[in-house]
Amino acid sequence: MTVSPEQIDRIVSNQHHDPFEILGCHQIQQNGQSVWAVRAYLPNAERVSVLCPEQRQEYPMTPVHHPHFFECHIPVAELNNYQLKIYENGHERVIYDPYAFRSPKLTDFDIHLFAEGNHHRIYEKLGAHLLTVDGVEGVYFAVWAPNARNVSVIGDFNHWDGRKHQMARRGNGIWELFIPGLSVGERYKYEIKNQEGHIYEKSDPYGFYQEPRPKTASIVTDLNSYEWGDSDWLEKRRHTDPLNQPISVYEVHLGSWLHASMEDPPIGADGQPQEPVQAAELKPWARFLTYRELAAKLIPYVKELGYTHIELLPVAEHPFDGSWGYQVTGYYAPTSRYGSPHDFMYFVDQCHQNGIGVIVDWVPGHFPKDGHGLAFFDGTHLYEHADPRKGEHKEWGTLVFNYGRHEVRNFLVANALFWFDKYHIDGIRVDAVASMLYLDYGRKEGEWIPNEYGGRENLEAANFLRQVNHVIFSYFPGILSIAEESTAWPMVSWPTYMGGLGFNLKWNMGWMHDMLDYFSMDPWFRQFHHNNVTFSMWYHHSENFMLALSHDEVVHGKSHIIGKMPGDRWQKFANLRCLFAYMFTHPGKKTMFMGMEFAQWSEWNVWSDLEWHLLQYEPHQQIKRFFGDLNHLYRSQPALYSQDFKQEGFEWIDCSDNRHSVVSFIRWDKDYQDFVVVVCNFTPQPHSHYRIGVPEHGFYRELFNSDAREYGGSNMGNLGGKWADEWPYHQRRYSLDLCLPPLAVLILKLDREKTVAERARYNLQS
């Protein structure tokens, strides 16, 4: 016996922080000669021998001190790639010894960068990675658990027995092990023993793939083998400023957009039927569509309607459907509800090849308490604050990340980068930013701790957000980083070098509330609330705002958008058209939730899919046609998007006609030669001679009329356009005498070609 009984006992009881010191091969002196001592701890093994392929020799191993701790001595100069022949339960198997492969992947520099919070691609080091060491293929595992006594890899390959693959501790509390012979598809977890001896089974925080809920094991996968076809899209994105482009976002929850029958199994990339994932307990006959099926159905739908981007409610792995994805346990794993990581890559790839960008909701503000997740990860408060006054959201029943800890911050910063790097996404929308920025968010007096200056601002969270945005824009110019921030925190969408948080867009929650309040009231009373319509332009240029009517506005008893509108059925649809036409002509990028485009009546229900049957009825067909035309018009007119965030891009014609509840304004293109005129009538009262001032003489073509017959309107309008009169109005030399339809928006544009032709004809006649 060349090792002490105490050391063997530590291995047997799984209490050794570095099993490589005992197990594997070690050169020793025996009778004045150098020999190799090979040791192995193999629970359940009846007998074991060492195979040396180079010498074509087999060396029996002997139990030492413990019936399953084996050792043998091999008198050779070099011992490479030896194998263990194991007899157990009447079966024989041959494996490479994991403890013959020391430190194959993680360097001291990796550990240093991680410890200071600056290893931007730590996901290429921690987690589970296919690796070939000395010609032997296997999987390398690494996990950060600094306060653990021991960590093991468990899985189907070792019958979930933590004694068989004990990991070795490296610097800064990182544990690692290379297991030969494993490959893609292996299920695994980490068995973590804390200092008191309690054992926790945890999914891999850096795992790329997990089992469908309710199972929780991580799955080994290879993210680098997918062949992308979107290089042209990525190259164009890199050289494009998205703030000067049209952005019209269709917000989607993939699990409730459309369901399929459980009797119709999905077909995988290999052409074989796959196991369907049931959509909800209350709908046992329904299943989720896969990422590939969604690519075939959702992308053409979005493309037809003219949206520029799809925004996905969180697709990172989460255990509870009812959280909508906002309680994440697998930050590096697209949810397996809809397929594999390669399937999600295919979805994004197909979006790009069809000219559609992909934004994903990202949730760095909190995480759930599920036992297999990040909570109490190594037996201590590792990812979360230990003090519940900083580490818990009681309102949501979730935990708050410790943004002041370098390794936790690194986990999140690298995660944001990961989705751009590995999945080619085009943007993130950061959820619940206000809950991160304020220490007293959702807390009563005495339930929170002030910052070092005595204030309520979470300085660590603010610095974290700056770091995230600085990093992702450094690697991927041309992307979007959108903040859902509901307070007046300054400079949210300003660059970090100017003192901002570094986002390039912020949801305009004030505009959303003002508009929904305004449009939900009886039109007669709108004259007394005219400020709801005009107020947003007083502060619009303080941030880069995105106008969003999101999923949050169609749940929890709020009714869907069409249900918020007053009046009879005709007026409800007219109000809806008026609201969205105003939204698409107001400065700012656009986001709207699924179902709004065809006026779904029922609230969004995560357990069901959309009310597609409504499209058999003409009013819903007409509103869908309205949205398609509105989107395509928006994208075709640079004046409606190219100067969203410059004061010169917007000009009121008249914002003071509260008596009629009418506003009119001009949107200018960046060269100030092209412009559109917008007139909004927010009451059911039409106006046959409504005059507005315009900047130039000529024929103004009616590009869009939300009251058109094809949209279900009354078809009032201006017969295709109007000539401007040389009649000064609104401090302008020329004016238009318009017919304003009820509850409608008109978009007009100077037709320079017709104007020049008419002038030439007039001069010729003269």
Swiss-Prot record:
The keyword Glycosyltransferase applies. It comes from the Bacteria. Keywords: Carbohydrate metabolism, Glycogen biosynthesis, Glycogen metabolism, Glycosyltransferase, Transferase. Pathway: Glycan biosynthesis; glycogen biosynthesis. Gene3D superfamilies: Glycosidases (3.20.20.80), Golgi alpha-mannosidase II (2.60.40.1180), Immunoglobulins (2.60.40.10). CDD domains: AmyAc_Glg_BE (cd11322), E_set_GBE_prok_N (cd02855). GO terms for molecular function: 1,4-alpha-glucan branching enzyme activity; cation binding; hydrolase activity, hydrolyzing O-glycosyl compounds. The keyword Transferase applies. GO terms for biological process: glycogen biosynthetic process. Catalyzes the formation of the alpha-1,6-glucosidic linkages in glycogen by scission of a 1,4-alpha-linked oligosaccharide from growing alpha-1,4-glucan chains and the subsequent attachment of the oligosaccharide to the alpha-1,6 position. Belongs to the glycosyl hydrolase 13 family. GlgB subfamily. Monomer. HAMAP family: GlgB (MF_00685). This is 1,4-alpha-glucan branching enzyme GlgB.
